[in-house]
Amino acid sequence: MVELTLPGPADVLAAAARIAAHATVTPVLRSRAMDALSGAHLHFKAEHLQRGGAFKFRGACNAVWALDEAQARHGVVTHSSGNHGAALALAAQSRGIPCHVVVPEGAVAAKLASIARHGATLWRCAPTQAAREAECARVQRDTGAVLVHPYADARVIAGQGTATLELLRQAGTALDVVVVPAGGGGLASGTLLALQQAAPGCELVLAEPAGAADTARSLAAGRRLVDFVPDTVCDGLRGALGEPNFALLHGKATAITVDDAATVAAMRLLWQVLKQVVEPSSATVLAAVLAQPARFAGRNVGLVLSGGNVDLDALPWMRA
């Protein structure tokens, strides 16, 4: 795992200033129908409308623009199932530097197309963490590119936290709780830092697929438990919780696991009621709130809709 100095709340503020000229300030959406369904006051942070179609542009942009000129000259490299790769490609394009993305077999076609569209070089590998990291290391050796890890990178973590900084300003009321999807932990740990900076009394809840529930198990056990084979429709949440991400989150967040049926049902609601094209990973946050209505009843809840890169020919409710 990548070794790094853990970022702090002030790093989120620095990231916000660094990416201000490049990232979109996405809207916060409200719906009376959604409030009635949930029994809570829901504030949806629409990161699926971010550049690249996902929150991950924030972290990638912060990482790319934090490089000095000598580092930037050789470009950047990462491994990604889609959204982070597309985000890094777009961020690298904004600075005019090379980008290499290692992609596992079976990645969503729409996400691969987004990576390629922004000029990155794609390198294929087997769909395992070991294969991803080995191919990344090879590309680094051959090109001199700087590794920008999808979630275990201080610059990325800080950048992801800027979405919640915006959410807190835009909500128009003090939020009681913020719910974000949990995969590798970049968004989750960045959100924690943002809350520590701007709303220390706000609760952080992580929404996670039951078929890839390593974050929930790790937080409950007090140590990383990442020996699992993911089985979930949420392709963006299949990665294992990172070491630095766990170090930040341990003892400071709780997790709710939701099965794929609940996630797909929540995704349909977001499409039909909120009129937003989001991917399954985004829908976990609404599924989590609906799974525990008593916990959220009457509360002001921020939900980060993490991305909207979907394959329209393979929507989850179309499967036999």
Predicted regions and their residues:
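PLP-dependent amino-acid enzyme catalytic core
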Residues: M1-A320
